[in-house]
Design a protein with these regions (language model features):
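Soluble catalytic domains of membrane acyltransferases
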Residues: 3-6, 11-167
Length: 167
């Protein structure tokens, strides 16, 4: 969705966040990458990562925001629903379908962003929470579906904000 990408990359982003710092970035931009990120701030984390990555990134988003009204818009923004155990219901069978879609995204040379911690705290805490195993499962499923013929990369992304209460 070129319009969304260009809207995020506007000068407003650079004005609001004049001091950005990327550490240990790869020299080349790879497709087929699973970005596993922490999630300290609810709304800003995906925007920052999308603005800094050139290949189109598909986002794993919690499934409860996929209402009948919002679903078409979220699909257009390359968001895939992820069903969490602590939300209740039959998450395993629903996630198997989503993991297949995510695997197809990776097979198509696109990248995927998943927040591995699984949730955001109401209070900003400067430490990582335990990472869930879904990103590794998606990566292995994608590799198995292409018979291990292409590389799929996994990159950790850490977000930290100097003044999180002023966002």
């Amino acid at each position: 969705f070129p319009l969304r990408r260009s809207a995020i990359r506007t000068d407003a982003f650079r004005i609001c966040y004049p001091r950005r710092k990327m550490v240990n970035t790869p020299r080349e931009l790879f497709g087929r990458t699973i970005y596993v990120a922490n999630h300290p701030a609810s709304f800003m984390d995906p925007l920052v990562i999308a603005a800094l990555r050139r290949p189109i990134v598909f986002f794993m988003t919690r499934a409860d925001v996929f209402t009948p009204i919002s679903k078409p818009f979220l699909w257009a923004c390359q968001m895939l629903p992820i069903y969490r155990q602590h939300d209740g219901g039959d998450t395993k069978s629903k996630n198997n379908e989503v993991f297949k879609r995510a695997s197809n995204v990776l097979k198509g040379g696109r990248s995927l962003l998943i927040f591995g911690e699984g949730f955001t705290d109401d209070v900003f805490i400067r430490r990582l929470k335990p990472v869930k195993k879904g990103a590794a499962k998606i990566g292995f499923e994608a590799l198995e579906s292409i018979n291990w013929s292409k590389k799929i990369y996994m990159a950790g992304v850490g977000s930290n904000y100097s003044r999180p209460n002023q966002m």
